[in-house]
C-alpha cells in the first residue's frame, strides 16, 4: 500500500483560507475541522492526510520529513533558518504586510533604536541593509504595547487593516515586505515522490488561478 502524503497546516487564518482552495482542487477533510480534535485528518483522497500543527512549526515538520509539504506564511519562512525546503508556489492567501510601526508624532531617542518584534531575523536584516544598528527586543505578542510603555521606539509586525495600530495610537511607518502563504515541500520527498508531489503542486496552482480569476 502506498503511504499517504502528509500536508502540514496550522489552524487560524491560514487554515480557514486554505480549505476553500483545497476544495477547488477537489480535496476535502473527512472530519469537520471546526469540531474535530484530531491532529491528523483523513481526506477524500486516500493518498493525502492533513497534519494540524502550530504555524511556526510547519517549516520544521516539512524540513525533517515529518510532513511531505506544508503551508506557511512568508513571515514564518523568513524566520526559519533551515534550507531543506522548496518553495514552489505562492498560494496568495492570508495576505498582509510586514511593517515598521510606531507613534507617528514621536521623535525616537537619539542613538540606537529599540525595535520590539516577533520577527527578529527579518528586522535585523531590514535595518542591516540600510546600514543601521538597532537593538531588537523579541516579544511574542501585544507588540502595540511596547512603544506605549517605553519598552521600544518602534515595532515590526504584520499589518492587515491597521485597525489595531490605530486603536493604540500607532501608525505604519515603513514597509518591509509583502506577506502571503506559500506551499513548501521537503527536498527529499520531492525527489522520492516527485510525480505525486508534482501533481499536487499543479492542482494547487490551478486552484489559485481559478480562485483569483
From Swiss-Prot:
It holds the Pfam family HisG. Its EC number is 2.4.2.17. GO terms for biological process: L-histidine biosynthetic process. Keywords: Amino-acid biosynthesis, ATP-binding, Cytoplasm, Glycosyltransferase, Histidine biosynthesis, Nucleotide-binding, Transferase. GO terms for cellular component: cytoplasm. It catalyses: 1-(5-phospho-beta-D-ribosyl)-ATP + diphosphate = 5-phospho-alpha-D-ribose 1-diphosphate + ATP. InterPro entries: ATP_PRibTrfase_cat, ATP_PRibTrfase_CS, ATP_PRibTrfase_HisG, ATP_PRibTrfase_HisG_short. HAMAP family: HisG_Short. Belongs to the ATP phosphoribosyltransferase family. Short subfamily. Catalyzes the condensation of ATP and 5-phosphoribose 1-diphosphate to form N'-(5'-phosphoribosyl)-ATP (PR-ATP). Has a crucial role in the pathway because the rate of histidine biosynthesis seems to be controlled primarily by regulation of HisG enzymatic activity. This is ATP phosphoribosyltransferase. The lineage of its organism: Bacteria, Pseudomonadati, Pseudomonadota, Gammaproteobacteria, Chromatiales. The gene is hisG.
Amino acid at each position: 500500500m502506498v503511504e499517504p502524503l502528509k500536508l502540514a497546516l496550522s489552524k487560524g487564518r491560514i487554515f480557514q483560507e486554505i480549505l476553500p482552495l483545497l476544495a477547488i482542487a477537489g480535496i476535502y477533510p473527512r472530519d469537520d475541522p471546526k469540531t474535530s480534535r484530531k491532529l491528523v485528518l483523513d481526506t477524500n483522497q486516500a493518498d493525502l492526510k492533513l497534519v494540524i500543527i502550530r504555524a511556526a512549526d510547519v517549516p520544521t515538520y516539512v524540513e525533517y520529513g515529518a510532513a511531505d509539504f506544508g503551508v506557511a506564511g512568508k513571515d514564518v519562512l523568513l524566520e526559519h533558518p533551515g534550507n531543506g525546503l522548496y518553495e514552489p508556489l505562492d498560494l496568495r492567501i492570508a495576505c498582509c504586510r510586514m511593517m515598521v510601526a510606531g507613534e507617528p508624532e514621536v521623535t525616537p531617542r537619539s542613538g540606537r533604536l529599540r525595535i520590539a518584534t516577533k520577527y527578529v531575523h527579518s528586522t535585523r536584516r531590514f535595518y542591516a541593509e540600510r546600514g543601521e544598528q538597532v537593538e531588537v527586543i523579541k516579544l511574542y505578542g501585544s507588540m502595540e504595547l511596547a512603544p506605549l510603555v517605553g519598552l521600544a521606539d518602534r515595532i515590526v509586525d504584520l499589518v492587515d487593516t491597521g485597525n489595531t495600530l490605530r486603536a493604540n495610537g500607532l501608525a505604519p511607518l515603513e514597509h518591509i515586505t509583502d506577506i502571503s502563504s506559500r506551499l513548501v515541500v521537503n527536498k527529499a520527498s520531492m525527489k522520492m515522490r516527485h510525480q505525486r508531489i508534482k501533481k499536487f503542486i499543479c492542482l494547487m496552482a490551478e486552484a489559485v488561478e481559478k480562485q483569483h480569476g
